[in-house]
UniProtKB/Swiss-Prot annotation:
Catalyzes the hydrolysis of N(4)-acetylcytidine (ac4C). This is N(4)-acetylcytidine amidohydrolase. The lineage of its organism: Bacteria, Pseudomonadati, Pseudomonadota, Gammaproteobacteria, Enterobacterales. Residues 6-101 form the ASCH domain. It catalyses: N(4)-acetylcytidine + H2O = cytidine + acetate + H(+); N(4)-acetyl-2'-deoxycytidine + H2O = 2'-deoxycytidine + acetate + H(+); N(4)-acetylcytosine + H2O = cytosine + acetate + H(+).
Amino acid sequence: MQPNDITFFQRFQDDILAGRKTITIRDESESHFKTGDVLRVGRFEDDGYFCTIEVTATSTVTLDTLTEKHAEQENMTLTELIKVIADIYPGQTQFYVIEFKCL
């Protein structure tokens, strides 16, 4: 069985598959992805594979520079996005945006 390259919380699976979630915001430990990378995607909870994505762009962002566009690409409000990122990465402020499309 081939390992997954990146995982997402299961609650995001439907939005990813439907194309409503087109970015992910990660910390430095996942800053190595590059435009053009093709990644196997699994669920964080059980590592079960559910799709393959292609990285279409990467950039950096801080909590203070998150925008409504980031929130739209995450399929949530800006307030929700800031809370989710702060909950997942407490105490961190520098992040890496990975834009992607499902293949």
